[in-house]
């Protein structure tokens, strides 16, 4: 069961990654159309304003179609066969579901969803152009999960020859069409009550203050090894747990209003404390890396620096910290618990000093969605955040250095044997086993992803040992038939992996942002045999 939950959480990362770019586009557009920043050139009707208005509208695509993107994104990772067709089926059935909901509202309740949307009545929205109940991303995710189940079960269903035209995607849609009718009726009956519960939750989270921010941030970090952290931040950042439509959309919608106001950001947007978890990526990660470097053996410092610098760059710029965190998680889990506590304390401290915003990503998000737009009227808050962050960088360094030395933790560069540092070089592994001898049959002439995939495929026990293969943002998630056939972690690290999570036959290989390409190469090798 846990394996399925982890897969589901990881699948949500496919659409989430799109927000990194579009958020910057909308943030920049907001800055460049702000007359307080740009002057008269940014007044409505000017060529400059019109240009950035067009760019902004394109950037808004992902935010306005978020439920559809989440619905289409899930089958990419969850469908066990013909993922592209599963995405098409999901889009068709999710749209059908929304039409059913709108029709039921009109026929049985006398409610014109189109009029409700036009009048901006809370609880209604146009999803993909269909006026319906606003089920937010939850509706898209639940329907997508149901369609994926139907797809995996019925796509290969063999029909009599005279009904052959209805096989495959058509049959899945036929079954789904029937299933969507009771789903729509249940939604109309249950969802309004659920919306009332969400409204109550929003009020509770708003009143929870500093303690709520601490708990939220702590859980978001501490659950990373399990993959369940997606279920912590998604309802807040992309769902309605804190504000309607989620913090991500709400912040972007009001960014110009907040930037032009002279009131404190915390009074304008108190719920913004639930999106401060990115600060540990910007300020905490460098402190951790410096502590590892400072405590490494003198003859290994150069190798440790070569290992950590690209990882820190990734963490700070893009907000992807798993490659760093998994360099010490399994050899020193106590450090990860301390990391979660410090991250939560940093976020709570910043919130106490009035820092709020949309800060779940990396430095690019901080600059373009927060610091640059807000600096003119909220410079004090921005400076306070940076000062507090740098103080915590020092705290991270001191605490991690103390614990590493006090407990003699074998972090990178402190291993008892020289051999261990070589685990991060796939070249050594290939030299030992021979170029292209991995079971995937990949030669040295092929690309780096293929080489990495070949080594990982061999470490997983070969294609015969793989039952399911998918990925999230940074991890390759694999279900194997026989865990005893897996090679030691050294084999995975030889391919450049940052760590391996083993839970019975459920395996997670932490690769980094190149994981989609690596997965694709492995799948190609498995098909070729």
UniProtKB/Swiss-Prot annotation:
Transmembrane spans: 8-28, 59-79, 91-111, 130-150, 170-190, 198-218, 222-242, 272-292, 304-324, 328-348, 352-372, 380-400
Recorded GO MF terms: kinase activity; protein-N(PI)-phosphohistidine-sugar phosphotransferase activity; protein-phosphocysteine-sugar phosphotransferase activity
EC number: 2.7.1.-
Major enzyme class: transferase
Intracellular or extracellular location(s): Cell membrane
Active-site residue list: 472 (phosphocysteine intermediate)
InterPro entries: Glu_permease_IIB, PTrfase_EIIB_Cys, PTS_EIIC, PTS_EIIC_1, PTS_Glucose_EIICBA, PTS_IIB_1, PTS_IIBC_a_glc
PROSITE patterns from the UniProt entry: PTS_EIIB_TYPE_1 (PS51098), PTS_EIIB_TYPE_1_CYS (PS01035), PTS_EIIC_TYPE_1 (PS51103)
Residues of the PTS EIIB type-1 domain: 450-529
Comment field on protein domains: The EIIC domain forms the PTS system translocation channel and contains the specific substrate-binding site. The EIIB domain is phosphorylated by phospho-EIIA on a cysteinyl or histidyl residue, depending on the transported sugar. Then, it transfers the phosphoryl group to the sugar substrate concomitantly with the sugar uptake processed by the EIIC domain.
Family matches, as PANTHER family: CYTOCHROME C-TYPE SYNTHESIS PROTEIN AND PTS TRANSMEMBRANE COMPONENT, PHOSPHOTRANSFERASE IIC COMPONENT GLVC
Name of the protein in its database record: PTS system alpha-glucoside-specific EIICB component
Organism from which the protein derives: Leptotrichia buccalis (strain ATCC 14201 / DSM 1135 / JCM 12969 / NCTC 10249 / C-1013-b)
């Amino acid at each position: 069961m846990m394996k399925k939950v982890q897969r589901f959480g990881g699948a949500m990362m496919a659409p989430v990654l799109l927000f990194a770019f579009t958020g910057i586009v909308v943030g920049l557009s907001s800055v460049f159309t702000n007359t307080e920043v740009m002057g008269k050139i940014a007044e409505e009707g000017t060529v400059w304003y019109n240009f950035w208005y067009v760019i902004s509208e394109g950037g808004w695509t992902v935010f306005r179609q978020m439920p559809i993107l989440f619905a289409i994104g899930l089958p990419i990772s969850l469908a066990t066969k013909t993922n592209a067709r599963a995405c098409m089926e999901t889009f068709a059935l999710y749209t059908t579901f929304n039409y059913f909901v709108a029709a039921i509202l009109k026929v049985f309740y006398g409610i014109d969803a189109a009029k409700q949307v036009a009048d901006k009545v809370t609880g209604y929205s146009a999803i993909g152009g269909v006026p319906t109940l606003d089920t937010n991303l939850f509706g898209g995710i639940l329907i997508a999960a149901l369609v994926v189940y139907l797809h995996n079960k019925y796509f290969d269903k063999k029909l009599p020859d005279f009904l052959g035209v209805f096989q495959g995607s058509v049959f899945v849609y036929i079954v789904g069409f029937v299933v969507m009718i009771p789903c729509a009726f249940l939604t109309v009956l249950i969802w309004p009550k659920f919306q009332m519960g969400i409204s109550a939750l929003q009020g509770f989270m708003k009143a929870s203050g500093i303690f709520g921010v601490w708990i939220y941030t702590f859980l978001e970090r501490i659950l990373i090894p399990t993959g369940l952290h997606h279920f912590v931040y998604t309802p807040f950042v992309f769902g309605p747990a804190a504000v309607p439509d989620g913090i991500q959309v709400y912040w972007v919608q009001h960014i110009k209003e907040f930037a032009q106001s002279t009131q404190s950001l915390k009074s304008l947007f108190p719920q913004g404390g639930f999106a401060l978890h990115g600060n540990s990526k910007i300020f905490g990660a460098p402190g951790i890396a410096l502590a590892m470097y400072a405590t490494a053996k003198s003859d290994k410092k150069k190798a440790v620096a070569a290992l950590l610098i690209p990882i820190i760059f990734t963490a700070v710029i893009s907000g992807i910290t798993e490659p760093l965190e998994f360099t010490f998680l399994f050899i020193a889990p106590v450090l990860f618990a301390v990391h979660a506590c410090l991250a939560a304390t940093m976020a709570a401290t910043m919130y106490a000093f009035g820092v709020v915003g949309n800060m779940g990503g990396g430095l690019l998000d901080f600059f373009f969605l927060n610091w640059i737009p807000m600096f003119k009227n909220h410079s004090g808050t921005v400076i306070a955040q940076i000062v507090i962050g740098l103080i915590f960088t020092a705290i991270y360094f001191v605490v991690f250095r103390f614990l590493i030395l006090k407990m003699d933790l074998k972090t990178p560069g402190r291993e008892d044997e020289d051999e261990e540092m070589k685990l991060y070089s796939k070249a050594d592994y290939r030299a030992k086993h021979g170029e292209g001898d991995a079971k995937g049959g990949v030669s040295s002439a092929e690309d780096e992803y293929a080489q990495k995939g070949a080594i990982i495929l061999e470490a997983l026990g070969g294609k015969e040992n793989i039952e399911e293969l998918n990925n999230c943002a940074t991890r390759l998630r694999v279900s194997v038939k026989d865990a005893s056939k897996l090679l030691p972690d050294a084999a995975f690290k030889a391919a450049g992996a940052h760590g391996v999570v083993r839970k019975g036959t459920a395996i997670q290989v932490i690769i980094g942002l190149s994981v989609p390409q690596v997965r694709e190469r492995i799948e190609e090798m498995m098909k070729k045999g």
